Amino acid sequence: MEKNELKVIRGKPEQQKMDISTVEVKNNNIEKLKIGCEAKKTTDRVENSGNGTGSISAPLTDLGPSIGDSHENKGADIPIHPPLDTQSHAKDDDWYDILVITADYEFPKNPANEDVKEERTQGD
């Protein structure tokens, strides 16, 4: 299986490319991704994007207790709101790996993490 990638646009180059390690699918919607720089590929497959080379855009909202660590090999569960409809661009009954997901991301406010504050982007 080829390497599956999750691209998160967050400012610093080392934070902009992460690999998918797990994908949580419920009722044909992608509800959560597990990401981490050391994850090499996923065994989870979802129906997506016809030829499997397209991208999906969705807001990513909360890194929870792992904020600031997702780009440092610890990984983080990222809920996606609203959930991604995995059938919206699917054709026939074929299944494809998710290759790339792009999303704008804004760090949640977390005053306790001063080091994370320095990594926040101020918008486009």
UniProtKB/Swiss-Prot annotation:
Compositionally skewed regions (Polar residues) per UniProt: 48-58
Residue ranges, annotated region (Disordered): 44-92
Protein's UniProt name: Uncharacterized protein K02D10.2
